Amino acid sequence: MAAENSKQFWKRSAKLPGSIQPVYGAQHPPLDPRLTKNFIKERSKVNTVPLKNKKASSFHEFARNTSDAWDIGDDEEEDFSSPSFQTLNSKVALATAAQVLENHSKLRVKPERSQSTTSDVPANYKVIKSSSDAQLSRNSSDTCLRNPLHKQQSLPLRPIIPLVARISDQNASGAPPMTVREKTRLEKFRQLLSSQNTDLDELRKCSWPGVPREVRPITWRLLSGYLPANTERRKLTLQRKREEYFGFIEQYYDSRNEEHHQDTYRQIHIDIPRTNPLIPLFQQPLVQEIFERILFIWAIRHPASGYVQGINDLVTPFFVVFLSEYVEEDVENFDVTNLSQDMLRSIEADSFWCMSKLLDGIQDNYTFAQPGIQKKVKALEELVSRIDEQVHNHFRRYEVEYLQFAFRWMNNLLMRELPLRCTIRLWDTYQSEPEGFSHFHLYVCAAFLIKWRKEILDEEDFQGLLMLLQNLPTIHWGNEEIGLLLAEAYRLKYMFADAPNHYRR
């Protein structure tokens, strides 16, 4: 039945994006054994398709053999309890997945790349603590050369995660000494923030290329509109807003067990453990309880949208930044039970209010049918068709729809595609830009897509393109890569934002 629904869905013009439950990316590699099992069953059939018919059939084969997000129930527990899933052996599934990827690469007949454009990639990885420039340990027995896509396709038992680098580019114990330029920037921030009335325009200008870690919490509070510019009013404002938030907790949180709120709370309760599942900080019960309260109270106070999957990701950058105000060591491995109750309450309330300010600007992304996202995806398609027609035509040739990969980019603000440290750096700029999370994000997505044009054009079938676009190799990215991405996005905005006819046919 699920297969029939899949075929019917893809053949009609879908207006509703539906569920977004299966999400993969830089932080969530595609390790679903059910998917790989379906692929290997049909591999022999794909090889027998004549070349002239391969283009037309590839999409329908993918649709027939893939369970859509729309066909999967919200309750993961029901899915995992099914007899078919219980009979799967994880080792066999992973081995099968590796074989599928190897066969897929052999299908593509291409000129051999020069050694200068290839990179050594380890076959087996282990989790290590490192800075943002840390290199992964390499198994000496594997000396084969692989292209950048294969970095993510090797499917190790545990994904590659340089732990410290995933959250921040600095930490108290291992950060390199600050340069003279960095010290000068930090001093300028401190002068701005300590003035009686902070010049917010100047603060935005200074924050665009990134905010120093030491002053990021207060800078984010100011840029989001949570704190007033006047220093004398800040303490009272924080006290009042924090008390107001916990007033909401007392008033509404007990209603989570009422019938008309049970579905909302149940979905939040399911989604919280999925939030950055490989970072120890977010697996602590106390942290998950904080996230549940934040998301439930926001959903109750915004009935037009309620809770939508993906909003849970938007809490994490604020939580990490405000936690770093009290923790100088490795944040992601820090045990929050070591903090006082007052500190935890401050972090929770500030995360709630700043997330609320963010969502106020993009709430049409999460109302019924998510019209904001559909509009942005269409705008991205039009923009890419003008700035890189070759990539756009490549998608059309292999029947790849922008909604199939860019929906997640808009819904999660690229958080599933980038390590968390990169998201925090990206949000420094988003909060410095007018309508950064809504308008400027479109140009960041366009620049992000074109960044991978070579890898995109190298893929010559629908499956390969979707695997690439849903699992882009950004795990080693840091401030430098984000800076280049933002510079390109700014160039695109300068060229097209005030001249819409430039990207209209």
From Swiss-Prot:
UniProt cross-references to Gene3D superfamilies, sorted A to Z: putative rabgap domain of human tbc1 domain family member 14 like domains, Ypt/Rab-GAP domain of gyp1p, domain 1, Ypt/Rab-GAP domain of gyp1p, domain 3
One term of GO molecular function: 14-3-3 protein binding
Coiled-coil ranges (or none): none
Residues with the N-acetylalanine modification: A2
Domain of life: Eukaryota
Region feature Disordered, mapped onto this chain: 105-146
Protein name per Swiss-Prot or TrEMBL: TBC1 domain family member 22B
The protein's role, per its UniProt record: May act as a GTPase-activating protein for Rab family protein(s).
Cellular component annotations (GO), alphabetically ordered: Golgi apparatus
Tagged with keyword Phosphoprotein: yes
UniProt organism field: Homo sapiens
Compositional bias ranges of the Polar residues kind: 129-146
Domain Rab-GAP TBC, first and last residues per copy: 210-434
